[in-house]
């Protein structure tokens, strides 16, 4: 099996970002045709778990206040950071300075107001309302 995998990687290449193959199909990894095959639910859950773990690790290492939050508030902040991006591409979560400052003071009402007073909240609508309610109340919405 290792020989086959090595041969396939040599022939197909290993591409970490999506690209269009020689016939125009969106492809990723080692010849995975995203247009026709996509990914399985298990693969999506694997990617989600990895991405959430990276997001939580980043939040813990970047914001000392994050670990002081209740689990519900940590989940809300993680959801928001996951959506906005933290380090790759054009991340927006680091730009929410007033929101971060309110959380660092455990001023959850102000954090809610500052989170909702944003372009992001307008873009995601109900998601922002739900997350900011969780942050203010410490309870799942």
What are these regions (language model features)?
Residues 2-17, 23, 32-37, 43-50, ...:
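Long, amphipathic alpha-helical surface segments
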Residues 22-25, 74:
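A structure-centric signal for secondary-structure junctions around beta-strands
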Residues 37-38, 67:
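Helix-turn-helix-type domain boundary/helix-start signal
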Residues 54-93:
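Active-site nucleophile-His-acid catalytic modules used for acyl/amide transfer and hydrolysis
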